[in-house]
Amino acid sequence: MTIQLRVPQKLVKNGPNEGYIYVKNNAPISLGHVVCWIEWTNKLNNQKKKEKLIFSVSRYSEEKLPIELPTRYCGTMQVEIKQFRIYDAFALFYTELKKLMCETYNILPAGFLSNVHINAQGLTSSLNVLNDKSAIDGVEIADFKLYEYGDNIKNIHWKLSSKMDELIIKQMEQNMQEKILVFFSLQEAQSSIEQYDSMLETLSAVIQSFLKQEKTIEFVWLEKDEQCYSIHTETEFLACLTDLMNKESSTIINTQTFMQQYYSFYTHIICIVDAEVPVFPMENIRFIQYGETSGASLNNVLFTRDNMHRQLGELYL
């Protein structure tokens, strides 16, 4: 007997989801009673689902058995043929085969098929310049102020200082090229598969909205080490999303420390997280936080699975 398991490597959530088991009987006798046990495992939380198939195979023939692949949530699923029992004609005795084969498949966000649009106009209108106290060669003088400890003495305006008998500092304005960082972190050990699914849907909607505006995005998620991708096209995003879904959940990190390291290098930072985050009074950082109850605080948007689609439609980045 020859047995093959075939599943697509990539499926879209709630889309077509058929896989197949091919069984070929090479013997001169029919197999009237064959039992197959299949097990699915969600790689994020190791939740399992089992199913039993009963069928028959005529002599020198092949059976193509359709199996329905679970696609309710985004993520990576493993499907395994755990056991095969081939019974005799009277279903009294059987030959058993165990752990025959295993395949994995990725379930992509439904946003790949829908036209979700997020208003990202705010990203181009805010923070077009970077005020830098240590700037030496600024593009132009933005303002003047009294000298404070730490100001660059090369920016002293000597003519005004001599007139006013006080040190006057030129505040320089330095153009900064737009740089967008999208940060994804699944931190809580108790995070549900529903939260993870909603976060991936949001990630897909945010990045695809940026790509439609022909913006380049740096995408970062944390495991034991930082994983960073530069995304220019939907194909590149699909590749990094596939990598993300095949990884273990992130280690718990200090979000505040991470933001202090990164915020000065990017004009805009979008953080998609599943844990409570500190308040960051900075215009260029936006947190999209997932939880069990809805609410909002300052620059944080708190999503739940129930309000996700409404919140995405109202989100202004």
Language model region names:
Residues 1-229:
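An amphipathic, basic-hydrophobic helix/alpha-beta surface used to engage anionic
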Residues 25, 148, 163, 190, ...:
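Disordered, low-complexity tails and leader-like regions
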Residues 38, 146, 182, 239-243, ...:
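Charged/polar, solvent-exposed surface patches and flexible loops
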Residues 178, 194-197, 232-239, 253-257:
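Generic alpha-helical secondary structure signal
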Residues 223-244:
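Short beta-strand-loop
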Residues 1, 18, 242-317:
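Von Willebrand factor type A / integrin I
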Residues 204-207, 241-245:
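Generic hydrophobic alpha-helical scaffold/packing signal
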